[in-house]
Amino acid sequence: MLAQSIRDCILWIRKTPDRALRAAKEAADLYQNIQQESRIYQNLRGANDATVILYLDKELSQYERTVKLRLQEFRVSSALLRGFEASQTESAETKKMVEEIEMAISRSQFLRSILSASSVKTHKPLAFEKTGIIPRSIPRTFDRLRRELLASSEDLVVQEFRISRYQTLTSLKFLASLIWIPWIVSWFLRVWWLEPTITMFWNQDQTQLFLHRSQEERALSDMRAFQEKVYFEVLVGEAPDPTPEVLQRRIQAKARDLAEASNQNSIESLANLGSDILACLILLAMLSLEKTKIAVLKSFLDELIYSLNDATKAFFLILVTDVFVGFHSTHGWEVILELLFAHFGFPESKKFIFMFVATFPVLLDTVFKYWIFRYLNHISPSTVAVYHNMNE
């Protein structure tokens, strides 16, 4: 059994060059397929979709890196295993395959040439185009009829479906990464670095027991509730009348428990603040580095939103406004602020909460109404009409 395992391991190691070369060949074939599909799509459309071009260029870059890494793996493993096997014929065939892969990657950098600043700057979302003398729907209708009457309209539909699939997959993956990567990284840093560091410095250098006045008031309130519970149990006969020494020990034990709980709560509050700051920094770094995927995600969300009918759009508008700026939204904002204060360990301020609830929803409602008047009227007047009718 051991000898067979050793032979299998040796065989797997000796096949590393072939395995790396096959992986490089597969990545090069996918690279060429994406290039061909994007070229056909551009010829049929007669125009460059900057978002699609950005995404396909990103895909080509990934496959190109895969090919280079696999070829490097092939060269290194071949150099280390040289002399084990491989005849001159096999070496010649392998060399020919490597040259074909390198030529396929270096040939025809199609998307790199059309991905320029001018093409990206001149591209604007369809829903935000400025209105002119002729309504936008008329030229769009003629353009749609022209493309449907072309002999290559079926190819256009297939290519648009593939491009849409690319766009949807990368949008969902990027959206999931924006949610999970900052949370996972910040959680890992909190557990293994931030919280132990805060615990060490807090327990060594901190002289005061409580982080702020509100925390002290909660501890005192819990202490009074414990004392009242003890006396109540004695009065109703659920517990025997304790001696002063026993009562003092119980009160001291409860005080130590409350002190330890308050100390741990202070450490967790500081750790929450630090980990959330780290998560925000990671999110900002991702947004600044992944501008290509942001453009793809924005295009995907635009298509998703504008594909809804007017009644559905109006329904979501009413839902959002009623939740955040509606009559009962003040209670929701109060709960959110109290949760944030407890999460970060900030002292609760009723005056600040009342002032925030009295001003922020009003400001948000004003901004929303201005957005409807300034932008939504030009983008989708029918949605605005349905929205007002549903509100009435």
Swiss-Prot record:
GO cellular component: chloroplast inner membrane
Topology relative to the membrane: Multi-pass membrane protein
Subcellular location: Plastid, Chloroplast inner membrane
Keyword list, A-Z: Antiport, Chloroplast, Hydrogen ion transport, Ion transport, Membrane, Plastid, Plastid inner membrane, Potassium, Potassium transport, Transmembrane, Transmembrane helix, Transport
GO biological process: potassium ion transport
MF-aspect GO terms: antiporter activity; proton transmembrane transporter activity
Transmembrane portions of the chain: 174-194, 269-289, 316-336, 352-372
Top-rank taxon: Eukaryota
Function noted in UniProt: Contributes to K(+)/H(+) antiport activity by supporting proton efflux to control proton extrusion and homeostasis in chloroplasts in a light-dependent manner to modulate photosynthesis. Prevents excessive induction of non-photochemical quenching (NPQ) under continuous-light conditions. Indirectly promotes efficient inorganic carbon uptake into chloroplasts.
Similarity-based family: Belongs to the CemA family.
PANTHER family referenced in this protein's UniProt entry, alphabetically: CHLOROPLAST ENVELOPE MEMBRANE PROTEIN, CHLOROPLAST ENVELOPE MEMBRANE PROTEIN-RELATED
Protein's name in the database: Potassium/proton antiporter CemA
Organism: Nephroselmis olivacea (Green alga)
Lineage: Eukaryota, Viridiplantae, Chlorophyta, Nephroselmidophyceae, Nephroselmidales
